[in-house]
């Protein structure tokens, strides 16, 4: 209803389209899960060291084509746009229901509720690109691998853990990637 196919390709396009009709685009910046999207395709990295206990992170790098400060500037530009709102999933859904939100970075767990509200205007697309250091950078999903959670109160918790381990083992991750 508010967004065209070309609008959803870039964060700039999303914000311009939403702003033109006084609406919001949302994303939860209080969560590292979501914030990773801005660092994932920049050449900056994080992970677990070989000791399996400590970690490394070079998101504050000062060398390379994309620096940590470049991402900071990109985030500030998005945050200062009146059409952007950083909010939790609960607040995102409230905005969907009251009509103030026209797009958001969220997960499949909200899809059925959004479809109920937006009906035929509902759509899901890949993450947009964003402007960083004068280039369009494709936003990334968190590390690009499959994760599974198991309900701790499951009647068959041991079997559920084994199934989750099998779905997410290295061999199956590679099959999914290929």
Please describe what each predicted stretch is:
Residues 2-7, 45, 153-160:
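Short helix-loop capping/hinge motifs at secondary-structure junctions, enriched
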Residues 15-20, 53-88:
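Glycine-centered hinge/linker elements that transmit conformational signals in sensory
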Residues 9-13, 84-98:
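Short helix-initiation/N-cap motifs at beta->coil->alpha
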Residues 15-19, 36, 72-79, 93, ...:
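Non-transmembrane alpha-helical segments in soluble domains
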Residues 27, 87-88, 105-107:
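Short beta-strand and adjacent tight-turn residues that come in two discontinuous sequence segments
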Residues 12-60, 101-103:
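Extracytoplasmic/periplasmic solute-binding protein
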Residues 102-107, 123-125:
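Paired acidic/hydrophobic, glycine-rich loop segments that form the ligand-binding mouth/hinge
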Residues 116-177:
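Extracytoplasmic/periplasmic substrate-recognition and gating elements
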